[in-house]
Amino acid sequence: REGEVYGIAGESGCGKSTLLRVLMAAHQPPLTVVEGSVKYVFGNSTVDALNMSEQEIRDLRWKEVSYVPQGSMHVLNPVRRIRDQFQDFIRSHRQVSKREATEMTSKYLTELGLPDSVMNAYPHQLSGGMRQRVTIALATILWPKLIFVDEPTTALDVVVQRGVIQLLKDIREQEGS
């Protein structure tokens, strides 16, 4: 249901991250789904993520359903500025100019309380907590209806953990995800 938050708890290695990859239709061999389905209902439309083409899955991801993987702060390209990574991401899903993508990014990062200086930084110039917040912003900038987040505070100190959790709460309030 819209605006609700759920948690999945379990011992290390019990399959929590694997479950999230299946829910995102992002599983890869040798992992296979023997039977069942992953159905999403958006308005009057129902889709089964396990029976979609690659293009349909690509269209679903990030616009409708988003995923922040475990250790996500390492998914940023180390040799590209944050601004460029946002531009590429937005432009791969929306028909906008680089300038429009940059403006959209700047506005969104500001709304999330991230400083403008982040835009021109390389990932290694940011703290672990800031990289995590940037990654969450990247996963949510297209306003997905559903967001999966896998251990968003791993390897962060307590103060930074609190900031990341608050960021996720703020996104939920702003977007209704």
What are these regions, as identified by a protein language model?
Residues 9-11:
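The feature captures the beta-strand-to-loop junction immediately N-terminal to the Walker
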Residues 162-176:
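Helical segment within the ABC ATPase nucleotide-binding domain
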Residues 141-145:
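A short, proline-enriched helix->beta-strand linker immediately N-terminal to the Walker B motif
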Residues 122-126, 130:
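Conserved ABC ATPase signature
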Residues 41, 99-117, 169:
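Conserved ABC ATPase "signature" region
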Residues 44-66, 84, 92:
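ABC ATPase NBD coupling module
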Residues 147-150:
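Catalytic Walker B motif of ABC-type/P-loop ATPase nucleotide-binding domains
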